[in-house]
Amino acid sequence: MTVNIYDNANEMASVLKETEQYTAWQNAFNAIQADEEAKQLFTKFQSVQVAVQQMMQSQQQPSADQEKEWDAIAADVQKNELITALLSTEQALNTLLTEINDIVTKPVADAYAKLRQK
């Protein structure tokens, strides 16, 4: 019997959409999409995250003005209940995805564990 692992992966993607974690995340995401202020703030927050990540990768330090701007955006994000709900549900969804990844990659992890034991 031939197994098409991609069929299984696509089925898992469909099943994922039925989980409590995904449903909660989707609802939180939709709430932000429906609120223009939250949507703009979240977009700005994502831009800041990318900028910070790029600076870290290139080992640059942000200017004092950049730090002030980023801190202000982070403070606004923490005050916005729609965004904090999205971030919370995203964390729960990521936990589930990490657990699934651990299950899927267990044969590889077990093989390396056996290699270390010898």
Curated annotation (Swiss-Prot):
Protein's recorded name: UPF0342 protein LCK_01004
Coiled-coil region list: none
Xref: HAMAP family: UPF0342
Homology family: Belongs to the UPF0342 family.
